[in-house]
Amino acid sequence: MLILACLPIGDSRDASAHLIQSIQQVQYVAAEDSRKFARLCQDLNIKHNAKVISFFEGNESEKIEELTNLLKSQKDVLVATDAGAPGISDPGYRLIRAALQSNVEIKVLPGPSAVTTALLLSGLPTDRFCFEGFPPRTQGARAKWFEELAQQERTVIFFEAPHRITECLVDAGAAFGLDRSGAICREMSKHYEEVVRGSIAELITWAKSKEILGEITVVLAGFDPASRQIADEDLIKMVFELEEIGESRKEAIAQVAKKYAVAKRVVFDAMVTYKSEDKI
């Protein structure tokens, strides 16, 4: 059986009795960091006889065959990431797929999640939301990533490293608008937990004001269609006017998006819709 264990995201007291019992009884543990797993067991006074196998992003591909063979031989393997749920911006998904393809039974031990914890702490709408993992590390790719999310009407949740949070928020502000509401949740459930709520502009000011350490989850409000100040027809008209004076379609869309402080995707989609209606 493959056991996917949700571990505490900060406070070891959040570990369930079911998790503790499973660690005590399982034969193998695939741990993202064996030292952190050992520390958790020490904090919870868990004594176990499981063989701990290193299983992290760098060796995930090569370890899948070994772990799958154990599962196929009727051994129980518990997957333990550093915190939270396996497969959620952590190793696990490929092993889950391999286990299913081998007809191995899968069991999940529910528990803490940085995604839902941050969502609740943010004070933003919880009825519809999406989790986007980590933004790209390079500025160009990250800016495009945010542009594609700018018109997302669901609350958007993602992780970010502390040393990139300022530049990340700047790119988010450029795509979403600096007045979009959001929250930064840092070191959740730990002693130095901090939650900062406000507009993206205010979050940028906060990020620039101090040295930021620890694990960060960012929550941003979804796009409100009613907040758009300009109709699609006006965006399209401006694109045509720029094309008439020699600008390319791509450059015209970029200029219109900048002028009206909307994502390029909004202008592009308006043009596509216009074309699909045979007006171009």
Where are the regions that the model predicts?
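Glycine-rich, flexible N-terminal cofactor/catalytic loop recognition
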Residues: 1-57
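A contiguous loop/helix-start segment that scaffolds small-molecule binding in enzyme catalytic cores
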Residues: 2, 76, 155, 162-280
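Short active-site oxyanion
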Residues: 23-29, 103-107, 155-156
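General beta-strand structural signal in soluble alpha/beta enzymes
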Residues: 31, 108-111, 158, 184
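Alpha-helix capping/helix-boundary segments
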Residues: 35-37, 84-85, 114, 164
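Conserved helicase motor
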Residues: 54-61, 135-136
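Glycine/small-residue-rich loop that forms an oxyanion/phosphate-binding "nest" at active or ligand-binding sites
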Residues: 64-113, 117
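Class I SAM-dependent methyltransferase SAM-binding "motif I" and its flanking Rossmann-like core
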Residues: 94-152
